[in-house]
Design a protein with these regions (language model features):
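Membrane-lipid interaction segments
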Residues: 1-308
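Primarily a LysM-type cell-wall glycan-binding module
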Residues: 301-324
Length: 324
């Protein structure tokens, strides 16, 4: 049986001071900022959860100069944080949803008084569910020795794990600039968000279909419109395989996230977009068995008891055993 041990909401706070590389100009003002989750995994330990992953950070800013030229900067921020979680231990199964709940990115001065430090203050919202597989014992029948036992039967329900799986799928496509938009000169940054559109239960597993909504910020050669935004959609599907058919009564918890996103300019009108989507699933079957729920004990029937033999002998036939 699969038992739900922990079901709660929590947060994970990430605070980092990031220093601009030497070749980047000082910051005059932040214009636009973005932070995305990449490759976030969780591991159950004794009394805590270990979160490991990366954040993709991107921002536009005006440089500290007479021209106030717009400059962009992109980097990755590693994350490794332990989260206290009472009642869990290593070996339990996790299914944790993770999303950005609060984001602050500010510029501040370094030791020399120059605006070159980026303060990242991020809060991740966690939807935590921890499960444990246990052996389930059920009473199917009983009898009384000193008394007559009248058995009361009923239906017992329990949940059984079919599969807990993580699969990755690669998707790619060509995006074209819409008429009237400035021509593409250089890619500045790319951003994506995953949406699950359909979860289909079938004989060989659970088929997950969805889309990745992509936005590409690029630099153009036109002075009047120095930047442009290219939008598009990637379609993905992934099968989480199971050893037995997934019935409509089965429960599925599916989490899909964007693990990698890369964009390469092909020419002034097109860009090639590649993405890796991570699909995590916990699929369970809701089972029902007839079990003994109660027993009514009463004095044995004297007449019936008197007619019972004192000993019974059974002679096994050829090929039979005692347990047949």
């Amino acid at each position: 049986a699969l038992d739900l041990i922990v079901a709660k909401k929590d947060i994970l706070r990430v605070k980092k001071d990031l220093l601009l590389p030497g070749g980047m100009p000082n910051i005059f003002a932040l214009l636009w900022k973005s932070c995305q989750i990449r490759e976030m995994t969780f591991r159950v330990l004794d009394g805590k959860l270990q979160a490991t992953g990366e954040l993709s950070l991107f921002f536009f800013y005006e440089e500290e100069s007479e021209t106030k030229k717009a400059v962009w900067y992109e980097t990755t921020v590693p994350v490794s944080v332990a989260i206290e979680c009472q009642g869990v231990r290593e070996g339990m199964l996790e299914q944790i949803g993770c999303s950005i709940g609060h984001l602050e990115i500010e510029a501040k001065a370094d030791e020399d008084g120059e605006e070159r430090v980026i303060l990242l203050d991020l809060v991740l919202d966690l939807d935590i569910r921890i499960y444990e597989e246990t052996n389930l014992s059920m009473i199917e029948d009983l009898y009384g020795v000193a008394k007559q036992a009248d058995v009361v039967r009923g239906k017992g329900q329990y949940r059984r794990l079919l599969v807990k799986n993580t699969a990755k799928t690669r998707v790619s496509d060509q995006f074209s600039i819409s008429p009237g938009m400035p021509q593409l000169q250089q890619i500045c940054g790319s951003f994506g968000e995953v949406f699950v559109q359909e979860i289909k239960k079938q004989s060989d597993g659970v088929l997950v279909k969805g889309t990745v909504n992509v936005q590409i910020l690029y630099e153009s050669a036109e002075e009047e419109v120095p930047c442009g935004c290219l939008k598009g959609e990637l379609v993905f599907e992934e099968l989480l395989e199971t050893a037995e058919p997934v019935k409509n009564t089965c429960s599925c918890r599916i989490e899909a996230s964007l693990e990698q996103l890369s964009v390469q300019a092909q020419n002034e009108q097109e860009a090639e977009v590649r993405a890796v989507v991570c699909v995590k699933g916990l699929i369970c079957a809701d089972c029902e068995e007839e079990i003994v729920t109660d027993a009514l004990l009463r004095a044995p029937d004297p007449e019936k008891q008197a007619n019972q033999p004192g000993i019974v002998v059974y002679l096994a036939g050829e090929g039979e055993t005692l347990w047949d």
